[in-house]
UniProtKB/Swiss-Prot annotation:
It comes from the Bacteria. Zn(2+) binds at residues 77, 236, 240. GO terms for cellular component: membrane. One of its GO terms (molecular function) is UDP-3-O-acyl-N-acetylglucosamine deacetylase activity. Belongs to the LpxC family. Pathway: Glycolipid biosynthesis; lipid IV(A) biosynthesis; lipid IV(A) from (3R)-3-hydroxytetradecanoyl-[acyl-carrier-protein] and UDP-N-acetyl-alpha-D-glucosamine: step 2/6. It holds the Pfam family LpxC. PANTHER family: UDP-3-O-ACYL-N-ACETYLGLUCOSAMINE DEACETYLASE 1, MITOCHONDRIAL-RELATED. This is UDP-3-O-acyl-N-acetylglucosamine deacetylase. The active site is at residue 263. One of its GO terms (biological process) is lipid A biosynthetic process. It catalyses: a UDP-3-O-[(3R)-3-hydroxyacyl]-N-acetyl-alpha-D-glucosamine + H2O = a UDP-3-O-[(3R)-3-hydroxyacyl]-alpha-D-glucosamine + acetate. It comes from Ruthia magnifica subsp. Calyptogena magnifica.
Length: 303
């Protein structure tokens, strides 16, 4: 049977918080079976916030969690990493209210987990298996999940910007066949420089810079190093989706499809899914019959 996973040893990282602009210290700590992903805010007495849809309180520009007044913001890139590497159980210590943004992708977090090492545990890994189609809509935007033997994300974005249009706004990734590490993990968040400058005048997005995002002028990419992928914009949105879906508490087996989606619509979809327990099941799988192949340390995989 496929087993649950944690990390082999404690590992630390430091980075800037995109909201505060302050340095954030983060420590990943191995956790016991069935612990799940849990955040611990060391700056407020070690209070805990579980990484689950039930605790989502923020869906504007990023995904944030809250438990009894204690918040953890911008969790989606780290959650995307845990999903891709099959990490079920880990304690994430922070000395601030937000996960550090690093370079705006999940690649630094992938490296961090790989540096810690991945440990299989004794308990069987639980998968969230979609059995029926569930759909949510908001204006002309929509998102749905349906039954599928594996994990697949199909997305179309619609940004009225020359470079985004040129890069391709539609993509489907079958994670049973295509590698998250090579195809998705290095895709960075993006936004208009004029919007960032406006927010910073209001003391918002103080940590945002070209070191952690693709900065757009009205018609071009401002970063000197250009793009990491030809279609980096839509790939980053898929990275976000993988992270948001992991707030179900287990790796999803199903096909996510969306048009002009974001954190709000993703969270609405999770809420509807969880409210309809007859449309999904929690299952375990034999290694040979697994619909998902997770990263293994003996893979010849590099970023």
């Amino acid at each position: 049977m496929i087993k649950q996973r944690t990390i082999k040893k404690e590992v630390k990282a430091r980075g800037v918080g995109i909201h505060s602009g302050s340095v954030v210290n983060m420590t990943l700590i191995p956790a016991k079976e069935d612990h799940g992903v849990v955040f611990r805010r060391m700056d407020v007495g070690g209070k805990l916030v579980r990484a689950h849809s039930a605790f989502v309180n923020e869906v504007v520009l990023s995904t944030g969690l809250e438990n009894q007044g204690v918040k953890v913001s911008t969790v989606e890139h780290l959650m995307s990493t845990f999903s891709a590497l099959g990490i079920d159980n880990v304690l994430v210590e922070l000395d601030s209210f937000e996960v550090p943004i690093m370079d705006g992708s999940s690649a630094p977090f992938i490296f961090l987990v790989q540096s810690a090492g991945i440990k299989e545990q004794d308990a069987y890994k639980k998968f969230f298996v979609i059995k029926d189609t569930i759909r949510v809509e908001n204006g002309d935007s929509w998102a749905q999940v349906s039954k599928y033997e594996g994990f697949k994300v199909s997305l179309e974005i619609d940004f009225d910007h020359k470079k985004v249009k040129e890069s391709g706004q539609k993509l489907s990734i079958n994670f049973s066949k295509q590698c998250y590490l090579k195809e998705i993990s290095r895709a960075r968040t993006f936004g208009y420089m004029k919007d960032v400058e406006m927010m910073q005048r209001q003391n918002l997005a103080l940590g945002a810079s070209m070191d952690n995002a693709i900065a757009l002028s009205d018609d071009d990419v401002l970063n000197e190093d250009g793009m990491r992928y030809q279609n980096e914009f839509v790939k980053h949105k898929i990275l976000d989706i993988v992270g948001d879906l992991y707030l179900l508490g287990s790796n999803l087996i199903g096909h996510y499809e969306g048009y002009k989606t974001g954190h709000l619509l993703n969270n609405q979809l999770l809420s509807v899914i969880l409210a309809k327990p007859d449309t999904w099941s929690i299952e375990t799988f034999e290694e040979e019959g697994s619909p998902i192949q997770f990263y293994s340390e003996d893979w010849k995989n590099s970023l």
